[in-house]
């Protein structure tokens, strides 16, 4: 009762929602584990990705709340302004990449095509018929999942460069530092992904690749937060 009257009602609602999401995350976690208890010893990559996505979503909500609390502000992540579309699109792509990263992990898709920049001798995996859209949309196929995961990384990089060119063009000097921090992390993440692949998924490198995604989301949100005036 004390906190109900002392804490801003909107903040209280937010914390209750986080509590509900954490409880739901527990349910999703059990749902994931249950997929490996019957007829298989590994878990469904779809359920794994759902569990991971929920974790990152909760983490992102808390980080955004922390930024507002620290700066005594009330910035809205869903602010509907065209100038922020490219940054929001970048964050969307990063979350999509995390999902496909879970697919790669769940399917052990990193154990095939362990070459870069080509997938063996070709840009496209040679065991997929890209003329048949059903094969390309088969997210149970290791080759398809790895191909999409690779190319999402390229897309994220080019979108980020586009954002950087706009920052330079419009001389948004207050974004130079957060942009460079994020740029360094993106380069590190890409390098770790490549090294994990060509090292036959060395456990340390693969783990660092996964862990660094947490910092990537943190600094992406920091970059977006500072871009909102």
What feature does the model see in each segment?
Residues 1-229:
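Polytopic transmembrane helical bundles with strong interfacial aromatic enrichment
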